[in-house]
């Protein structure tokens, strides 16, 4: 029998070892598969746990954020309400502007209705102390001025505006109310004034103020007398050759009832008499021959009632009928 070749021996040797190797491999496969399955399950469980945890935290964060947002909104709303409340109770520091709406006469007092505005004041109160409130005419001359105090009785604003009535007593205004052209006036509001005495009494709803300095009142009265002479000139001319009555004659520096007359005294008497006799007109005596015909000096003011009579006798009777004394009223006929 021929000897086996080396190839055949190798094949026989390999054939004898394959069953052991295969058996080993077959035993390992289930173990490997089981390990893989276990790892996969563990991985799935881990992923699930992570996912669950993430979603839970996200939900908590969302809830927390939502709660925080709502809380912030509530805090902001409360803060806004507190600020609004503070604005309502806080006093305004802005000095308001003023405009004259109307004037009227109440006895010898002039009542001015004034519109004040200060946008910054909103709905707050203004407590200005010692405030000069002046009215000026179209040529910027002061025709009324007094010192008012809003510290104890504040000016209450609504949406930045307020309307008040102010009382100007004689000595605080220098033009008759019916001769003031409201639309051509301007007003000045100034704090830090020095009141000249106590405030005059209020008249109804119109609050009274204190006088301004005597020197200022004297200057305004002198200017007012000059304005009145010019204003009344044509009305005086209308009385030429017509009997009328003279209610006073006044000269600066003259003594009347123990008092030296100053311009503000003369103008005060003019306003007092005109309040009762609205036709009254002021004249400068030196401008009319009736007062200069005998060569006398006539450098003084005269106030005519403006009433017209049929005779000088009727004019004299009018004086006595209206309670004037012999030295307070006289019949005149200007020419």
What is the predicted function of each stretch?
Residues 1-18, 24-335:
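Acidic/polar low-complexity segments and flexible, solvent-exposed patches
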């Amino acid at each position: 029998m021929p000897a086996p070749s080396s190839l055949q021996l190798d094949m026989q040797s390999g054939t004898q070892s394959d069953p052991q190797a295969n058996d080993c491999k077959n035993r390992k496969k289930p173990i490997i598969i089981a390990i893989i399955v276990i790892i996969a399950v563990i991985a799935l469980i881990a992923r699930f746990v992570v996912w669950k945890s993430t979603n839970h935290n996200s939900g908590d964060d969302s809830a927390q954020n939502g709660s925080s947002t709502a809380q912030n909104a509530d805090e902001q709303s409360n803060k806004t309400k507190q600020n609004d409340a503070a604005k309502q109770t806080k006093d305004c520091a802005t000095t308001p502007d003023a405009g004259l709406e109307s004037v009227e006469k109440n006895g010898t007092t002039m009542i001015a209705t004034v519109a004040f505005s200060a946008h910054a004041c909103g709905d707050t109160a203004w407590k200005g102390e010692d405030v000069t409130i002046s009215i000026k005419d179209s040529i910027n001359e002061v025709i009324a001025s007094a010192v008012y105090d809003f510290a104890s009785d504040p000016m209450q604003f609504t949406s930045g505006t307020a309307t008040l009535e102010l009382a100007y007593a004689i000595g605080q205004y220098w033009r008759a109310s019916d001769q003031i052209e409201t639309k051509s006036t301007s007003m000045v509001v100034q704090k830090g004034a020095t009141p000249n005495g106590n405030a005059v009494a209020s008249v109804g709803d119109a609050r009274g103020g204190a006088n301004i300095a005597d020197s200022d009142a004297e200057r305004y009265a002198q200017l007012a007398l000059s304005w009145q002479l010019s204003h009344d000139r044509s009305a005086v001319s209308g009385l030429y050759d017509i009997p009328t009555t003279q209610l006073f004659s006044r000269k600066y520096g003259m003594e009347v009832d123990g008092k030296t007359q100053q311009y503000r005294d003369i103008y005060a008497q003019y306003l007092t008499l005109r309040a009762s006799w609205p036709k009254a007109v002021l004249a400068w005596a030196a401008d009319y021959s009736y007062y200069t015909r005998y060569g006398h000096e006539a450098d003084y003011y005269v106030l005519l009632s403006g009433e017209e009579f049929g005779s000088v006798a009727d004019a004299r009777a009018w004086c006595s009928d209206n309670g004037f004394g012999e030295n307070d009223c006289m019949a005149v006929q200007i020419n």
